[in-house]
């Protein structure tokens, strides 16, 4: 368990550092791409260790959040790897996992899980709609791959930043507000970047 916690904190710190630098730096050039790879890889460590800890400790909240963040991290990475956005088998498996996870999160009626679960379901429906449009040979929105990349990777970063705040800030009331505050602040920034780079 100590090893898992060590991996979780180390990869979390690395992901948070890389993600924060990406947030403030010029987008799209080589340093961005390099740090983006670091963010993606370290997030794998964050999620894997979180899942191990959640299963060992029986912490369902942590498990649901880990799956939610992994979905965004993976989907944001895939949007860059295959700009056509055509889903393969693994993509569908991740979407299915995110859908089930989202439904379960909403069904808990925990305010934090309810919000993030609803968001997960919304993102899943967007993914399904994209695949339906592709099957009908309809043209996707301009720079759809970049829109998805920005949205999903910022979402994954929000998960990391939120965890950092929750671990390091004590006695914040109401507690659920601290969980949702980074989303409220960073989503408008995400929309700004999407408009700036995608039109």
Task: List the predicted regions and their residue ranges.
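Alpha-helical membrane insertion/targeting regions
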Residues: 1-199
């Amino acid at each position: 368990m100590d090893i898992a916690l060590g991996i979780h904190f180390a990869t979390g710190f690395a992901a948070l550092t890389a993600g924060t630098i990406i947030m403030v730096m010029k987008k799209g050039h080589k340093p961005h791409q390099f740090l983006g790879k670091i963010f993606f890889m370290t997030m794998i460590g964050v999620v894997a260790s979180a899942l191990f800890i959640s299963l060992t400790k029986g912490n369902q909240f942590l498990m649901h959040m880990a799956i939610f963040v992994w979905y965004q991290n993976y989907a944001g990475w895939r949007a860059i790897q295959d700009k056509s956005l055509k889903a393969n088998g693994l993509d569908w498996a991740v979407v299915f996992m995110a859908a089930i996870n989202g439904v379960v999160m909403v069904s808990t009626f925990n305010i934090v899980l309810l919000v993030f679960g609803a968001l997960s379901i919304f993102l899943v429906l967007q993914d399904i709609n994209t695949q339906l449009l592709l099957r009908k040979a309809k043209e996707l929105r301009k720079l759809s791959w970049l829109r998805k990349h920005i949205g999903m990777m910022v979402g994954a970063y929000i998960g990391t930043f939120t965890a950092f705040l929750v671990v390091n800030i004590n006695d914040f009331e109401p507690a659920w507000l601290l969980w949702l505050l980074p989303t409220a602040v960073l989503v408008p920034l995400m929309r700004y970047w999407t408009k700036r780079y995608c039109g």
